[in-house]
Amino acid sequence: MLVHTYSAMERPDGLGAAAGGARLSSLPQAAYGPAPPLCHTPAATAAAEFQPPYFPPPYPQPPLPYGQAPDAAAAFPHLAGDPYGGLAPLAQPQPPQAAWAAPRAAARAHEEPPGLLAPPARALGLDPRRDYATAVPRLLHGLADGAHGLADAPLGLPGLAAAPGLEDLQAMDEPGMSLLDQSVIKKVPIPSKASSLSALSLAKDSLVGGITNPGEVFCSVPGRLSLLSSTSKYKVTVGEVQRRLSPPECLNASLLGGVLRRAKSKNGGRCLRERLEKIGLNLPAGRRKAANVTLLTSLVEGEAVHLARDFGYVCETEFPAKAAAEYLCRQHADPGELHSRKSMLLAAKQICKEFADLMAQDRSPLGNSRPALILEPGVQSCLTHFSLITHGFGGPAICAALTAFQNYLLESLKGLDKMFLSSVGSGHGETKASEKDAKHRK
């Protein structure tokens, strides 16, 4: 055993150990505890592994004025007590199991996936080494997918029992809905017949697939085409938002925010998705639009219908159908072509009338209305697609254009009738003049 002693060491200033001891004899002995023996025995080595290191006092040590104070305890009151009394609990050796328990628990918590029982187990003081996750399903994809497993699994823990009535929840599946991959309606569980709200009452309230009332106002947006002096706001309903997120447009969060006139912000898309989830609509992040963006994409349905109505009024009252018909009739004033041209105009009028009658039978949904169908489903579905792309502007606009074209055809037929009468009258006058000349010659 190798033991180091310091009894014979001398100071560099020439004073011996005896002189130094005489100088420091007045200091209290409790200020400096006995130094541990420096040895290399196995027992001492095992105990030294858990001994705290030496920490100097947190204050600067002033030089001791040797020989100037008769009483060192009175001159230095801060040395009266034990300066290392606060480190006494650290000097107690800890067993290896307690020292490594916290790192092992932290590593286990880092390796295990976040489950249902991790926070409750820690809150109840349960042993972290026990694995409760094998008997309990983890809810990773929402309540609708794991509600039955949560109600059936024997948790056996207080405070973690299934919610009352949770086992009665069942997912509603509409047989007529074919919105599997592109669905924007959030599937939520609805109570069964035994619950207070039945499926019949939900159907009456138009809560189809978890969506709230389609006629409920989602927000109000200012018009894009109105003047500043007559700015009007249009109400956007929940049903319109659902139509904009559904085919054929399938708008993403960025385009929908532009349609709703929402200012761009850092978390604008996330806030919009959270608000849509509250009304039962699902807008996944990173979604791509399905249709090309046009100027009509920025219009809400109310403004698009307003634009179509104004366009129809202008076409009916301001389109120069008579001037255009007279101009074209003068270019085809040959008497030999009058009959053939009139036949072509009558045929065009008939074709235009047939097409106008077809457009008049269009029953595309306008807003939240669902009129009864008149046309065949194949033709009506195509017209509905066109109406959804134009937000209700396309059909009325085409009808207004057809009305203007029909007015042109009517004015053209009137012009041809006048030209035919004038040509017949002029021909009859020429025959009378020739007869008079023949009589004078006789």
Swiss-Prot record:
One Gene Ontology MF term: RNA polymerase II transcription regulatory region sequence-specific DNA binding
* GO CC terms in record: chromatin; nucleus
Where found?
Answer: Nucleus
- Name the major location: nucleus
Keyword Transferase belongs to the record? no
Keywords assigned:
Activator, DNA-binding, Nucleus, Phosphoprotein, Transcription, Transcription regulation
Location of motif PPxY motif in this chain is 54-59
Q: In which tissues is it expressed?
A: Expressed in skin, primary keratinocytes, immortalized keratinocytes, and HeLa cell line.
Task: Name the segments for region: H-S-H (helix-span-helix), dimerization.
Answer: 287-417
Q: Name one GO biological process term.
A: regulation of cell population proliferation
Q: Matching InterPro entries, A to Z?
A: TF_AP2, TF_AP2_C
Q: Which Pfam families match?
A: TF_AP-2
Q: Which residues carry this modification: Phosphoserine?
A: S246
How this chain assembles, per its entry, is:
Binds DNA as a dimer. Can form homodimers or heterodimers with other AP-2 family members.
Name the job this protein performs. Sequence-specific DNA-binding protein that interacts with inducible viral and cellular enhancer elements to regulate transcription of selected genes. AP-2 factors bind to the consensus sequence 5'-GCCNNNGGC-3' and activate genes involved in a large spectrum of important biological functions including proper eye, face, body wall, limb and neural tube development. They also suppress a number of genes including MCAM/MUC18, C/EBP alpha and MYC. AP-2-epsilon may play a role in the development of the CNS and in cartilage differentiation.
Q: Which family does this protein fall into?
A: Belongs to the AP-2 family.
This one is known as Transcription factor AP-2-epsilon
User: What's the name of its gene?
Assistant: TFAP2E
